[in-house]
A protein has these predicted regions:
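Conserved active-site alpha-helix within GNAT-family acetyltransferase domains
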Residues: 132, 155-173
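Active-site/acyl-donor-binding loops of N-acyltransferases
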Residues: 175-185
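Acetyl-CoA-dependent GNAT
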Residues: 2-13, 18-22, 26-126, 135-137, ...
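Residues embedded in well-ordered beta-strands within globular domains across many folds
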Residues: 102-103, 150, 183
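Conserved beta-strand-loop-alpha-helix junction that forms the acyl-donor binding cleft
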Residues: 123-126, 150-161, 177-179
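Glycine-rich phosphate-binding loop
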Residues: 129
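Conserved GNAT acetyl-CoA-binding A-motif
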Residues: 135, 142-154
Length: 188
């Protein structure tokens, strides 16, 4: 029998949890603190792409800007209520831990495209299938209205490139010097 890890239910999801349908909800300006806490728990991402960790004020401005663009969506990825890990904060609206953040824009760069600007999973949850489930869920939700999804990979990030390739995306655009796009046709 497998020993439980610090995340408890993540290692052995509850029978009621559907691992293929992660719970997401739109983020609003009141959620900027949750997004910032996620960033603080995942500093290696910002180190890898060689940018300073955004301040809480910068995160608030970014979330507000996204809410003013009808094509752009920032969603909180919410985990199983039983998940526990250092730095994992809870969403007061749902009483679920914030497992990640998804930022995407519809009809960009072309009509019928969707571009994932950021999929960031909490450091303690990386490598456990959370990101793959989020991507599969987004593909399902956009399948009837989107022909192609592009995923932005910033900096020299071989683990992100490998992640997207594993999800069936292929290298599509070198927007260098620090940006590559991976793409997947999904329909429409």
């Amino acid at each position: 029998m497998r020993e439980p890890d610090a995340l408890g239910a993540l290692a052995t999801p509850s029978a009621s949890a559907d691992p293929l349908a992660p719970l997401t909800r739109p983020a609003d300006v009141h959620d900027a603190g949750l997004v910032h806490a996620l960033y603080l728990a995942t500093p290696s991402y910002f180190e890898m792409i060689a940018i300073p960790l955004p301040t809480s004020s910068e995160v608030r401005t970014e979330v507000l800007a996204a809410r003013q663009d009808p094509r752009r969506h920032i969603e909180l990825v919410l985990g199983d209520p039983a998940w526990r890990a250092p730095g994992l904060v809870r969403d007061a609206r749902t009483d679920r831990p914030v497992a990640g953040v998804l930022d995407y824009k519809l009809d960009y760069p072309e009509p019928g495209d969707a571009t994932i600007n950021l999929l960031l999973v909490h450091g303690a949850l990386q490598g456990r299938g959370v990101g793959a489930r989020v991507v599969a869920d987004l593909e399902r939700r956009l399948g009837g209205s989107t022909r192609r999804i592009l995923a932005a990979v910033y900096g020299r990030n071989p683990s992100a490139s490998g992640f997207w390739e594993h999800q069936g995306y292929h290298f599509a655009i070198d927007a260098g010097p620090v940006l590559d796009w991976y793409a997947k046709e999904i329909g429409a």
